[in-house]
């Protein structure tokens, strides 16, 4: 999701007029830490987020269930398996943070249902605990790391819209950070910084340009790209609805 609640924001000098002052007022909620950030009466998108992630988890589960039944080299299957495990961990990480509590607040609190196969079973009648969801995330990332190790360095850093090893390491660092495992967070963040040659995107001189498009593969910070512009803005549209 879009990182709105931080101080990494700079406004251009260009005057911007919008046809609706209400639109501007609603967006102020996102950038002012307003307690009414979410107006649940209009939060139909929350159910869409839930179903969207579980649809993608179904895709990852299907890959893992049937991968051995298809042809392919050891390296090709390892690549696909590594991507599926990383993506499933990514989806569950987002789900448990959206619909569960903070990891170190109450590990026994309700998290989200863990669906680990593509079988057509209910599986949604019980929510796993926050601790159980994080345990599964770490297990999936362990499996992903093992499978990435089979690949060449070039294959590990495949660019474009396929998950890669540095993206998995970045996700692992973020998971560790949410668990307040600072040693693990630093370990995997350092791997991303030291091992892959990514550079910071130079935005100096762009402050006068409205709507700088930094979400491109040409951005030297880009590790992995996915989704569409709608995915970036959908949570803003949901979050910025203002109460009457």
PLM regions: where:
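Conserved, well-structured interaction surfaces
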Residues: 27-99, 128, 146-149
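Hydrophobic-face positions in mid-chain alpha helices that act as interaction patches
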Residues: 180, 186-244
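Structural signature of alpha-solenoid helical repeat junctions
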Residues: 73-80, 133, 157-160, 164
């Amino acid at each position: 999701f879009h990182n709105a609640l931080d101080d990494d924001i700079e406004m251009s000098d260009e005057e911007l007029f919008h046809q609706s002052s209400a639109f501007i007022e609603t967006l102020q909620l996102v950038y002012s830490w307003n307690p009414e950030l979410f107006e649940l009466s209009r939060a139909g998108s929350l159910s869409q987020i839930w179903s969207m992630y579980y649809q993608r988890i179904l895709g990852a589960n299907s890959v893992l269930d049937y991968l051995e039944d298809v042809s392919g080299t050891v390296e090709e299957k390892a690549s696909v398996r590594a991507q599926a495990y990383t993506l499933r961990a990514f989806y569950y990480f987002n789900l448990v943070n959206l619909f569960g509590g903070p990891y170190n607040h109450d590990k026994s609190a309700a998290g989200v249902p863990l669906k680990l196969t593509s079988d057509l079973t209910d599986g949604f009648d019980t929510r796993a605990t926050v601790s159980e969801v994080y345990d599964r995330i770490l297990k999936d990332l362990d499996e992903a790391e093992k499978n990435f190790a089979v690949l060449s360095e070039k294959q590990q850093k495949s660019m474009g819209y396929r998950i890669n090893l540095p993206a998995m390491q970045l996700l692992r660092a973020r998971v560790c950070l949410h668990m307040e495992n600072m040693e693990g967070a630093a370990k995997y963040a350092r791997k991303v910084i030291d091992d892959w040659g990514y550079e910071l995107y130079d935005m100096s001189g762009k402050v006068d340009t409205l709507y700088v498009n930094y979400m491109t593969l040409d951005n030297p910070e880009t590790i992995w790209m996915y989704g569409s512009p709608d995915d970036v803005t959908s949570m803003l549209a949901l979050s910025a609805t203002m109460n009457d």
